[in-house]
């Protein structure tokens, strides 16, 4: 793709997201979503092959269905309230339809089926945009309508998303699919807290984006797409491979890494709201995520593949691309746990 075209497309994606975030009028929000969706399809099809075309088609159909459902919910709400303002949701059916549409855009269970398939069919760069930037717009709308959301519906979706995110990643060897299932689980944690403490959801989303960006950028540095290729990278890029494994443990929520902060704070907040069973179930199902990350770490770092002496020396001669943003991203993605007491202002 030519640089001027790429710049225009990326600018359109960013503009669409900003329109959604800054609007209080449902029609403008819908226009922002459509701009975002139509602009990202060329990014998904950057590597022109049947897999990318299939992934783009699946993404388009899912997002178009979600947009249609959102507009139906907005129309029903307009009939009852007579207003396009986002804060005036007076009809419970409209609220359920809007929530369903936004969760479909995010890839929450039971509308999660498109996320692993689309992520697997596209490049690492496109996958990074899909699993980070594309989550911001729907989450910002959920944040704004959180007082009107049906809590029981969203909590059920959150619990099943955490379960599906852990269960689906267990037998995966493709790194992009592992990241996709991890994304589903993280979205579940965010959905669980949004009706009780929306500000904590913003913290969770920020940390998730930081960790996912860092992980994808490291995958791109050493061109790893499977667990086997990651294992072979140990001799060529030992430092980068070590960073990937630490980031994956952070994504799994293992203390003392940054990924433990949102899980800790969400469980604490739900417990304060007299909910015991749901946070307990979520904590237990989160162990599935941690298990497949630990298994990946063990198979990559603690068991060495048979290699010659020449292979062991490769790291001294390999040229590593410069990545200026990576060091601060990795530090924030792994070492923020000591700052947790400062986050008490979110309560």
Swiss-Prot record:
Asked whether the UniProt record includes Transport among its keywords, one would answer yes
Q: Where in the cell is it found?
A: Mitochondrion inner membrane
A GO CC annotation recorded here is: respiratory chain complex I
Q: How does it sit in the membrane?
A: Multi-pass membrane protein
Question: Which reaction(s) does the protein catalyse, per the Swiss-Prot or TrEMBL entry?
Answer: a ubiquinone + NADH + 5 H(+)(in) = a ubiquinol + NAD(+) + 4 H(+)(out)
Q: Which GO terms describe its molecular function?
A: NADH dehydrogenase (ubiquinone) activity
Q: Which domain of life is it from?
A: Eukaryota
Q: Which Pfam families match?
A: NADH_dehy_S2_C, Proton_antipo_M
Give the family from UniProt: Belongs to the complex I subunit 2 family.
Q: What exactly does this protein do? A: Core subunit of the mitochondrial membrane respiratory chain NADH dehydrogenase (Complex I) which catalyzes electron transfer from NADH through the respiratory chain, using ubiquinone as an electron acceptor. Essential for the catalytic activity and assembly of complex I.
Q: What is this protein called?
A: NADH-ubiquinone oxidoreductase chain 2
Identify the gene encoding this protein. MT-ND2
